[in-house]
């Protein structure tokens, strides 16, 4: 179908699809004849004419329907163009084909063109309708049935065709039976598409005034070839683009000159097929116009086309169509992201590149497109004249070949050939089937032939061999030679194979040595990087100190610097005014000491202000800096005389004393750069020359910054380095300056005359501000670690604010220590103006100093007690410091872990002070202290906070004030929830921040958090977000309104389900309870929460370290994610490189055997954690906390358990599995062993025993013989005996009948009636008798009817006989007489019931109940024997047979008697008048069932398990002592067994697991705490760690061991927490000599790791029964096994779970490629593997119980701390293996031989090793595969062994 579009539509297409997006009012004129049902499609066409592309399918369908109903003369796509326009366009195209036309015509931006919005009237029709379906003025628009304007079509005729009368159809072709009279497709009103062949066209679907005539359909001319080919394609809506323009249209009159505006803004359609556009399927959304072609962008082309089109438009206007149509203006709202231009100056006008177009195009090809030119690097070179000529030649040649006779002529070119019609597939005929069968049969015959030939060959060879065997012949020379050749070849292959194997071994050995060298080099690199970072931070600190000492600071400079620093960094107290006042006060004091500072200028080695020299220090190494500043004097000495001497050139004694104090504070472990990099971000406003020097140093600052990357991004690091350079204007600082020992320098100076000098504290000649700055820049974490409380300090703090150097670096998480203002620990940064005496008296101890004596420490501690005194404090020796950093020469005061136990100073406590270690090994709780806390308790908080909770609030408030995230890691039970609520209340009261806050908690404690909020802070509006989808949707009403609620409490599952909702909201504080849920950074939970929009984050967890350091890193990175790709925490690889060594040593050999380097690294880790982690233990903060005792109860296996355990281990497949390397199979075996230990029913249930039922008994085989004998020998002939009963000749046969009954039968006799019926039937049968005539069907039917009548007669005759026989049955005496005369002797000794009713009452009175009790009935006897039968009828017969055995034992009569008796006993009895009769109970049912089915005894549940036996004794003891217990287990099935156990013993209990509803958990918890009658509460270990308070119990019983000790620790804290008044006893049930002892050992090793890294001596009040554990574990930590099978199981467990037996010093298993041992799974993934090894139903139950905190445990798998094995003497061992043990000794004794060149002669092995090493030089070394990546790739390989073979 081809259509005619208006010039507007043509213009839209000719303009390369570029239209104004704000205008959509272009009008079109359409034909008045429309296809019925095309209204919807036409609306789409009209609405989307100029703005979009129409859908291909819609266009195609519309075109088809239009073609089928409108037979109008075919008009080509360019029919809208008149002849004049064609001539103009042709002339223009000729001009455009010149070579330089494409270059000379300027380009223009397509977006700048606009089209005239005035509609262009139709060319041919006097009427036209607008695009909005409104008629013109004076016309009434016609509406269709829907009330919409009719569809619009272009008219193709001047007049409407007449409605001719119907003409006969043309004759149909012979291959067609009928032809469609109307449209083949009808679109109904509801938009459905129907076929027009079977559905008539309704009149209502046609327009009212436009009728489709049949003549219009029939008079359609045949389209030409091109139009036909075009009609098959989807016709575009604006089909004005065509290659050929027909000349059928008469040329219009010459048009007048068009207006300039119209000629400038309208365009003519280019005759290019690529420029045509398709309409969008949606008319409302204008589609983006397609990118115009390169030629179409030339402005000259568009102008020419616009001019020609405008001429054509003006010429086509008629008077009737010249009226203007209403203009529609669509206002499009600009996007919100675009700032509107309100002034011309806001527009970014691009400067002109040339005054004229010629100059522009001369330069445009060199200027990039982005800058306004035409140069595109990726495009082809400039279009030159030669290229244009070449293209023109190609075009001319194509035109020439198109002519007749050319290659492209229609008669020669294959492109013009019609497409071949697809032939229909030919149906299979008989010949086809026959051919297929023949082919198949041929294949089978050929295959059979081949098999026969092969068999014949084999038989021939076998015959030949057999013939030679039977007829041996002497071998010929050729045969002998052939055999020798084969033997030689075999030997050669063997030698080559052995030789290749030897070289392969050599290659493996060389690679092993290379790997060892690489590992050593890698360790050196890591250590060097660590030391370099430490040295760099220390050098920066020393440079700043030396620079401050030698710099002359004027009052103005000092004031300006202080003001800039104070204004540039946030104040600690949040008061900018106080900060400014304190800065001014400090600057005045500094100006008073300028004379002293001038005396220190000789500290500098040069007096000039060479900034380049100072800046160049950043790029120098440590050795170069030492050489450069070797002549600098030290800042302090180690004794009192050196401090006061004049050689140091100090100003005065107070200054020297202050220097010692500052040195004491600044000295630190030089190997620790974690906090050295926490320097302040001081800003100085130096001159521009210093800024230029900073820019020169930027290149050197881009290198890696070591541990600085832990805390700062690249931009912050660069800024810090620039500031460090600008702070050194004239002084060249010293490289390594000897730091003064505090114990030698501070104390004597402080104790002069019993009091300290009343002088300000200075650092050498440092002033107070300089001291604060240097301390902030330094790396020491004493500021964040120690608290020196005093009322004077508190008073002073109210007047002073942070020093300029104590600011925070923007919003970085891990900022400097002084910026993390913990309670009362802002000593150096806020109290620098305090005199020395006040400082000492206030603080007692200066932070982290080497105490000279215990008395001094006690005296200082007594002067001002600290917040928390750690129970054990010990400092390392000088050797430890030397081992940490060999280059450091100064003694450090960084805390170390001692040989026996680490000090609590190393723990990440934020508020600690040094105390004295008590001689007792058992440490008690510290003495109460009264420190000063600055953060007030918010008035919104109801209740009273404990002292340590108030300090926690102060710490949290300090974190928020410094824009820092943190971890509140208090031990379970210390009230982390209350402290969090207090923090939110503090934000509301003091910062006026009410929210919104997001609190994410486990599902089980959601309601608990809501109750705590309502109890402690009822002023908050709480939204508990949970429920189904509809409930959550209802709760989200008013979600973005801050006044609806303040705190949203939800669970981890809800966050994952509705993460999009939570992401869109900006949260002020996001708090995660039980934060170990996000310990896996690969889990969906971690990644989802990481992307939330939050201002601050807080993590609450009682176990910050559960398994390894990867989990700790996940928490740290979650708190400090990088912003815009910069900053954030260090990556995981670097973090593991720092701290992998101590972790592996702890897991291998325990905490006591750590080397000095590992201890130093542990100290560094503590310093990393201190700034943002608060960890308090119950023993440290609670003065009246009850003690906690831990016991291990070893349970002997029961007999059944031992049999199952040993039997499983002794299996061949079990041994093979334990020795294999497939860890899934090993874990499966270990899980089965654990099930046996927990209860044997978990491993295999006690069966319900039944007897074996034989299908046939043994005597049944003789049944046929017995029947044969009876039939043969005992057979009776019927004719020889007379049946008297049949003859009715036995008088007493009917005595069971009553005479009355027989008389009544005789009275009601119907004998006569039956006789009459018989006779009548006989007559009918005789009359209808017919002989059999099978000749016809009719005769057969007549015979069948006759036979039926005779059959009826015989039936009636039999009835007459039976009736007469029964009528004659009469008794002699009758039933009543016999019953009356019968004595009930079977009822004796009971008196029979009288038959006279009058005597029944006397019979009841005479009945004796004693007689009834003496002689019980059968039912009473069965009830009395029920207990005996139940207890002792427990042995079922081995075999039972069928019922045929009874017939041989009892006979037929016996069986009949038993059956009759059974029927009588089971007859229903009516017990009550209105109750239906019921059968009596079977007395033999219980005995029959007991002897048929043997159910296991309930008592065996306890006696089959050693743990339950021990638990029974333990519960009895607890119940007698008034204790209550919590019983924890891992497996859900064990909970079921415990329920049965408690039910058997009658104990009251409650059960809680993951399947318990959220609403019920709090109810169960409250019920247990308030009901002392409940003895036990059985829980799952997973549900035990969900923040549930069960202080009503004082005993915790672990039924089985969890491989993760953190889970057990959480379970203990359910009852050992605040509110517990009694001592807590913990019992662990461990099966002795089993795998559980090894699990206990592994848990102890992980606990050691937690003690060293996090706790540092956590169990101070836990009196663990270590002797019992040592009895099992042995002296070396190995489990004492009872037999070889136990040893194999323990070794397999070590291989799988990781242990000393399988990991070397490095952690990789002993081989280089890991093939020698099991593919070790991650330690944290073992729990998941154990779940996979369990039964399916157990796994489902465990998932339901652990869904709150273990939902994504499969993702939580992380690799344990593993490192490559230490080579040791592996090389020598391998040499010994190659040479042999004895031969090696002989080689050592031999004399060394030399060759002719005087070189030592080596062995072949050495030669091979050297040769291979030389050959492998430069080749890539295969490094050990990363276990984590390997697990990720092989995660889908469930249980497959993926090791290298």
Curated annotation (Swiss-Prot):
Residues 1-13, 63-84, 216-243, 762-777, 815-834, 922-933 have a biased composition (Polar residues). Its EC number is 3.6.4.12. GO terms for cellular component: Swr1 complex. ATP binds at residues 970-977. It catalyses: ATP + H2O = ADP + phosphate + H(+). Keywords: Activator, ATP-binding, Chromatin regulator, DNA-binding, Helicase, Hydrolase, Nucleotide-binding, Nucleus, Transcription, Transcription regulation. It is an enzyme of class 3 (hydrolase). SUPFAM superfamilies: P-loop containing nucleoside triphosphate hydrolases (SSF52540). Catalytic component of the SWR1 complex which mediates the ATP-dependent exchange of histone H2A for the H2A variant H2A.Z leading to transcriptional regulation of selected genes by chromatin remodeling. Pfam families: Helicase_C, SNF2-rel_dom. The keyword tRNA processing does not apply. Residues 168-180, 574-585, 898-909 have a biased composition (Basic and acidic residues). Residues 24-38, 98-108, 888-897, 1769-1781 have a biased composition (Low complexity). This is Helicase swr-1. Residues 1-329, 539-713, 749-935, 1702-1724, 1751-1783, 1816-1845 are annotated as: Disordered.
């Amino acid at each position: 179908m081809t259509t005619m579009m208006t010039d507007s539509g043509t213009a839209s297409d000719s303009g390369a699809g570029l239209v104004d997006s704000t205008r959509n009012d272009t009008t079109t004129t359409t034909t008045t004849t429309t296809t019925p049902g095309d209204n919807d499609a036409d609306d789409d066409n009209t609405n989307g004419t100029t703005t979009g592309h129409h859908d291909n399918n819609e266009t195609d369908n519309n075109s088809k329907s239009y073609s089928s109903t409108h037979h109008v003369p075919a008009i080509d796509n360019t029919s809208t163009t008149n002849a004049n326009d064609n001539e103009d366009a042709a002339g223009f195209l000729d001009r455009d084909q010149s070579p330089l036309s494409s270059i000379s015509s300027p380009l223009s931006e397509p977006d700048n063109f606009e089209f005239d919005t005035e509609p262009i009237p139709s060319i041919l029709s006097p009427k036209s309708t607008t695009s909005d379906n409104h008629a013109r003025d004076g016309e009434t628009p016609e509406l269709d049935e829907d009330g919409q304007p009719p569809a619009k079509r272009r008219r193709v005729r001047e007049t409407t065709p007449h409605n001719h009368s119907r003409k006969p159809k043309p004759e149909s072709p012979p291959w067609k039976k009928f032809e469609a009279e109307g449209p083949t497709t009808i679109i109904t009103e509801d938009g459905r598409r129907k076929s027009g062949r079977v559905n008539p066209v309704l009149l209502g679907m046609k327009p009212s005034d436009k009728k489709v005539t049949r003549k219009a359909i029939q008079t359609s001319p045949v389209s030409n070839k091109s139009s036909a080919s075009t009609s098959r394609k989807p016709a575009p809506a604006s089909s004005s683009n065509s290659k050929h323009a027909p000349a059928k249209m008469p040329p219009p009159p010459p048009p007048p000159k068009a207006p300039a505006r119209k000629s400038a803004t309208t365009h003519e359609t280019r005759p290019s097929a690529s420029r045509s556009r398709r309409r969008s399927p949606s008319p409302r959304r204008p589609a983006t116009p397609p990118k115009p072609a390169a030629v179409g962008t030339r402005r000259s082309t568009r102008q020419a086309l616009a001019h020609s089109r405008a001429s054509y438009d003006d010429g086509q206007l008629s008077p009737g169509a010249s009226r203007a149509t209403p203009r529609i203006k669509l206002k499009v709202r600009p996007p919100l992201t675009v700032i509107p231009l309100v002034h011309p100056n806001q527009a970014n006008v691009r400067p002109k590149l040339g005054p004229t177009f010629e100059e522009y195009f001369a330069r445009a090809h060199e200027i990039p497109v982005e800058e306004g030119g035409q140069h595109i690097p990726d495009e082809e070179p400039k279009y030159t004249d030669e290229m244009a000529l070449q293209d023109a030649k190609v075009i001319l040649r194509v035109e020439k070949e198109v002519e007749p006779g050319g290659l492209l002529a229609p008669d020669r070119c294959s492109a013009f050939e019609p497409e071949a019609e697809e032939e229909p597939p030919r149906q299979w005929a008989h010949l086809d089937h026959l051919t297929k069968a023949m082919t198949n049969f041929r294949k089978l015959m050929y295959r059979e032939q081949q098999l026969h030939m092969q068999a014949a060959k084999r038989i021939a060879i076998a015959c030949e061999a057999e013939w030679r065997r039977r007829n041996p012949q002497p071998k010929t020379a050729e045969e002998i030679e052939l055999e020798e050749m084969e033997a030689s070849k075999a030997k050669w292959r063997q030698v080559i194979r052995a030789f290749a194997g030897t070289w392969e071994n050599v290659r493996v050995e060389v690679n092993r040595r290379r790997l060892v060298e690489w590992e050593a080099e890698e360790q050196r690199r890591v250590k060097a990087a660590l030391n370099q970072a430490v040295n760099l931070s220390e050098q920066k600190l020393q440079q700043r100190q030396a620079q401050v000492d030698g710099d002359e600071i004027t009052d103005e400079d000092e004031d300006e610097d202080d003001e800039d620093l104070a204004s540039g960094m946030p104040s600690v107290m949040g008061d900018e005014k106080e900060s400014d006042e304190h800065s001014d006060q400090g600057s005045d004091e500094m100006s008073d000491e300028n004379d002293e500072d001038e005396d220190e200028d000789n500290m500098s080695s040069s007096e000039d202000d060479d900034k380049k020299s100072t800046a160049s220090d950043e790029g120098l190494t440590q050795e170069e800096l030492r050489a450069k500043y070797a002549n600098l004097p030290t800042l302090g000495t180690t004794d009192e005389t050196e401090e006061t001497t004049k050689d140091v050139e100090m100003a005065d004694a107070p200054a020297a004393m202050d220097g010692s104090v500052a040195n004491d504070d600044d000295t630190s472990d030089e190997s620790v750069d974690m906090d050295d990099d926490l320097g302040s971000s001081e800003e100085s406003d130096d001159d521009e020359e210093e800024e230029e020097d900073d820019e020169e140093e930027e290149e050197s600052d881009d290198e890696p910054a070591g541990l600085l990357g832990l805390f700062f991004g690249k931009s912050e690091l660069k800024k810090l380095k620039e500031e460090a350079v600008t702070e050194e204007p004239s002084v060249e600082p010293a490289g390594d300056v000897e730091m003064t020992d505090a114990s030698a320098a501070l104390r004597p100076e402080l104790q002069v005359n019993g009091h300290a000098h009343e002088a300000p504290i200075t650092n050498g000649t440092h002033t107070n501000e300089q001291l604060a700055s240097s301390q902030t820049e330094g790396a020491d974490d004493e500021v964040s670690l120690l608290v020196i409380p005093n009322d004077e300090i508190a008073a002073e703090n109210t007047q002073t604010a942070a020093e300029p150097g104590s600011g925070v670096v923007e919003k970085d998480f891990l900022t400097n220590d002084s910026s993390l203002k913990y309670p009362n620990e802002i000593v150096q940064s806020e109290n620098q103006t305090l005199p020395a005496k006040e400082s000492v008296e206030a603080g007692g101890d200066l932070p982290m100093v080497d105490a000279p004596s215990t008395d001094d420490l006690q005296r200082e501690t007594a002067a001002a007690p600290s917040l928390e005194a750690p129970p054990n404090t010990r400092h390392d020796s000088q050797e430890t410091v030397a081992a940490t950093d060999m280059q450091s020469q100064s003694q450090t005061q960084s805390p170390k872990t001692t040989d026996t136990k680490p000090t609590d100073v190393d723990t990440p406590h934020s508020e600690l002070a040094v105390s004295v270690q008590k001689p007792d090994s058992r440490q008690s709780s510290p003495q109460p202290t009264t420190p000063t806390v600055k953060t007030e308790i918010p008035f919104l908080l109801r209740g009273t906070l404990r002292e340590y909770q108030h300090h926690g609030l102060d710490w949290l408030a300090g974190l928020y004030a410094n824009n820092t995230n943190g971890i509140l890691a208090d031990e379970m039970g210390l009230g982390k929830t209350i402290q969090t609520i207090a923090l939110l209340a503090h934000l509301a009261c003091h910062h006026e921040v009410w929210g919104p806050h997001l609190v994410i908690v486990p599902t089980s404690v959601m309601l608990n958090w809501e109750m705590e909020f309502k109890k402690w802070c009822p002023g908050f509006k709480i939204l508990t977000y949970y429920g189904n989808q509809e409930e959550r949707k209802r709760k989200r009403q008013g979600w973005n309104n801050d006044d609806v609620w303040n705190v949203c409490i939800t669970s981890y599952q809800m966050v994952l389900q509705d993460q999009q909702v939570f992401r869109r909201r900006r949260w002020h504080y996001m708090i995660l309870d039980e934060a170990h849920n996000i310990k896996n950074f690969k889990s969906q939970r971690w990644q989802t929460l990481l992307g939330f929009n939050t201002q601050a984050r807080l993590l609450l967890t009682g176990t910050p370290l559960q398994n390894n350091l990867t989990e700790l890193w996940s928490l740290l990175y979650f708190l400090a994610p990088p912003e815009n790709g910069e900053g954030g925490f260090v990556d995981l690889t670097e973090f593991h490189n720092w701290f992998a060594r101590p972790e592996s040593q702890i897991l291998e050999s325990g905490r006591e055997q750590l080397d000095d380097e590992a201890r130093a690294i542990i100290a560094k880790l503590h310093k990393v954690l201190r700034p943002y982690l608060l960890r308090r233990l119950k023993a440290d903060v609670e003065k009246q906390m009850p003690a906690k005792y831990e016991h291990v109860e070893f349970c002997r296996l029961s007999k059944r358990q031992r049999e199952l355990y040993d039997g499983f281990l002794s299996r061949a497949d079990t041994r093979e599995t334990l020795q294999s390397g497939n860890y899934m199979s090993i874990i499966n075996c270990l899980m089965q062993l654990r099930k046996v230990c927990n209860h044997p029913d978990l491993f295999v249930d006690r069966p319900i025993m039944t007897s074996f039922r034989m299908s046939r008994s043994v005597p049944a085989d003789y049944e046929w013989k017995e029947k044969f004998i009876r039939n043969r020998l005992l057979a009776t002939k019927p004719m020889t005996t007379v049946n008297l009963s049949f003859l009715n000749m036995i008088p007493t046969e009917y005595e069971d009948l009553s005479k009355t009954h027989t008389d009544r039968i005789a009275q009601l006799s119907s004998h006569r009636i039956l006789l009459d019926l018989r006779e009548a039937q006989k007559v009918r049968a005789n009359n209808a008798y017919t002989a059999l005539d099978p000749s016809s069907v009719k005769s057969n039917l007549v015979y069948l009817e006759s036979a039926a009548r005779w059959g009826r007669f015989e039936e009636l005759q039999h009835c007459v006989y039976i009736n007469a026989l029964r009528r004659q049955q009469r008794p002699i005496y009758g039933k009543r007489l016999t019953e009356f005369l019968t004595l009930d002797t079977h009822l004796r000794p009971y008196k029979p019931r009288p038959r006279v009713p009058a005597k029944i009452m006397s019979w009841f009175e005479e009945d004796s109940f004693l007689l009834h009790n003496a002689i019980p009935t059968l039912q009473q006897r069965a009830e009395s024997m029920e207990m005996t039968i139940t207890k002792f009828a427990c042995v079922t017969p081995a075999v039972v047979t069928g019922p045929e055995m009874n017939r041989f034992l009892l006979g037929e009569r016996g069986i009949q008697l038993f059956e009759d008796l059974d029927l009588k006993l089971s007859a229903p009895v009516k017990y009550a008048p209105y109750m239906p009769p019921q059968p009596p109970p079977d007395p033999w049912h219980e005995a029959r069932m007991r002897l048929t089915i043997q159910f296991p005894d309930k008592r065996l549940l306890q006696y089959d398990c050693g743990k339950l036996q021990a638990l029974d004794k333990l519960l009895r003891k607890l119940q007698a002592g008034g204790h209550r217990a919590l019983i924890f287990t891992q497996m859900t099935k064990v909970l079921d067994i415990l329920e049965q156990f408690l039910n058997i013993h009658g104990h009251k209990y409650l059960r809680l697991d993951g399947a318990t509803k959220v609403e019920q958990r709090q109810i169960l918890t409250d019920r247990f705490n308030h009901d002392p009658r409940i003895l036990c509460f059985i829980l799952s270990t997973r549900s035990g760690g969900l923040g549930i308070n069960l202080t009503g119990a004082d005993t915790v019983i672990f039924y089985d061991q969890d491989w993760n000790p953190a889970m057990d620790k959480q379970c203990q804290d359910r009852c050992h927490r605040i509110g517990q008044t009694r001592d807590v006893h913990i019992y662990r049930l461990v099966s002795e000599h089993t795998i559980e002892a090894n699990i206990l050992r592994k848990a102890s090793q992980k606990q050691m790791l937690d003690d060293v890294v996090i706790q540092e001596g956590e169990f101070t009040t836990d009196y663990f029964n270590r002797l019992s554990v040592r009895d099992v574990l042995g002296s070396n930590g190995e489990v004492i096994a009872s037999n070889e099978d136990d040893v194999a199981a323990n070794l397999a467990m070590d291989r799988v779970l990781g242990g000393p037996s399988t990991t070397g010093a490095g952690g990789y298993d002993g081989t280089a490629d890991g093939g020698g041992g099991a593919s070790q799974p991650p330690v944290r993934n073992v729990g998941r593997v154990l779940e996979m090894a369990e039964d399916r139903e157990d796994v489902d139950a465990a998932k339901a119980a652990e869904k709150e905190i273990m939902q994504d445990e499969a993702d939580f798998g992380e690799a344990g701390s593993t490192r490559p094995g230490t080579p040791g003497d592996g090389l020598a061992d391998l040499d010994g293996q190659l040479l042999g043990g004895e031969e090696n000794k002989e080689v050592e004794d031999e004399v060394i031989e030399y060759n002719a060149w005087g070189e030592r002669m080596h062995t072949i092995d050495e030669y091979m090793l050297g040769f291979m090493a030389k050959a492998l030089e430069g080749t890539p070394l295969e490094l050990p595969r990363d276990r984590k990546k390997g697990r990720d790739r092989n995660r889908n390989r469930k249980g497959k062994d993926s090791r290298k073979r």
